[in-house]
């Protein structure tokens, strides 16, 4: 029996009886980054003042030298990430989706691909 329910007049379905995975996605992301950082000293985490929401504060505690707090300046964070990647680092950036679009792509284009 399907756990999806059709919504009359809509192009989507609603999930019912959803089960929780027991872990939040941010915890999986942070744990994976921390594992990767053990084997690769070029991995760097950049944050846009969302440490509590992203879980990146854990990375700041375990790898403070590879954590960069960029503040509420997502476009600038992408410029920093582009510069890091051009010098051999592997930056991972975090921000909320609405702040990682439009102007941020201009910065990526100008700093990393132009």
Residue locations for each model-derived region?
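Thiamine diphosphate
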Residues: 1-114
């Amino acid at each position: 029996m399907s756990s999806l329910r059709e919504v009359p007049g809509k192009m989507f379905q609603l999930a019912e009886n959803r089960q929780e995975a027991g872990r939040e996605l941010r915890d999986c992301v942070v744990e994976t980054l921390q594992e990767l950082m053990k084997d690769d000293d070029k991995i760097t985490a950049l944050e846009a003042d969302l440490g509590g929401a992203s879980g990146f504060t854990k990375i700041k505690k375990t790898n403070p030298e590879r954590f960069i707090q960029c503040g509420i300046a997502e476009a600038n964070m992408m410029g920093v990430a582009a510069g890091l990647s051009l010098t051999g680092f592997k930056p991972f950036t975090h921000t909320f989706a609405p702040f990682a679009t439009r102007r941020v792509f201009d910065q990526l284009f100008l700093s990393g691909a132009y």
